[in-house]
C-alpha cells in the first residue's frame, strides 16, 4: 500500500522546478482562465517561506503592489503553475522571512548572493 502511494506521488511531481529558497526573487507564471480564454499571469516577488513535503510542497511569494504588500501561496507541483523563474538569489540567514511583513522601503531590502565561479 505504501509503495503505491509513493509511486503516485512521484508520478504527480513536476521535474522542471528550479532550485530556489527564501530570499530569492522569483517570477511565477500562473495559468488564469477568464471567461473561456486561458492566459498566463506573472507574479514576481520575494520568496518568504518554503515548505518541502514532496507533492505537497508549497512556497509563499511577497511583492509590493501600489504601496500595498501582497502575498500569494503556491503549491510547487500544481498544474496551475506554468513556470517558475529565479531572477535573483538572495542572501538571508533565516528560513522564514515573515519579518519582512512589518518592514518597508530600505529596511526590507535583501542582499544579493554572489555566485562563485
Swiss-Prot record:
Gene Ontology biological-process entries: translation
Keyword list, A-Z: Ribonucleoprotein, Ribosomal protein
Gene3D superfamilies according to UniProt: 2.30.30.790
MF GO annotations: structural constituent of ribosome
GO cellular component, one term: cytosolic large ribosomal subunit
Pfam families with a match to the protein in the record: Ribosomal_L19
HAMAP family, sorted: Ribosomal_bL19
Function, as annotated: This protein is located at the 30S-50S ribosomal subunit interface and may play a role in the structure and function of the aminoacyl-tRNA binding site.
Family: Belongs to the bacterial ribosomal protein bL19 family.
Protein name according to UniProt: Large ribosomal subunit protein bL19
High-level lineage: Bacteria, Pseudomonadati, Pseudomonadota, Gammaproteobacteria, Alteromonadales
Amino acid at each position: 500500500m505504501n509503495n503505491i502511494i509513493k509511486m503516485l506521488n512521484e508520478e504527480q511531481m513536476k521535474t522542471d522546478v528550479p532550485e530556489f529558497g527564501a530570499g530569492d526573487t522569483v517570477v511565477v507564471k500562473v495559468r488564469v482562465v477568464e471567461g473561456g480564454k486561458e492566459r498566463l499571469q506573472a507574479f514576481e516577488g520575494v520568496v518568504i517561506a518554503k515548505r518541502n513535503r514532496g507533492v505537497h510542497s508549497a512556497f509563499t511569494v511577497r511583492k509590493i503592489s501600489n504601496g500595498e504588500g501582497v502575498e500569494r501561496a503556491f503549491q510547487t507541483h500544481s498544474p496551475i503553475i506554468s513556470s517558475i523563474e529565479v531572477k535573483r538569489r538572495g542572501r538571508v540567514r533565516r528560513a522564514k522571512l515573515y519579518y519582512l511583513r512589518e518592514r518597508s522601503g530600505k529596511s526590507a531590502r535583501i542582499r544579493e548572493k554572489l555566485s562563485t565561479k
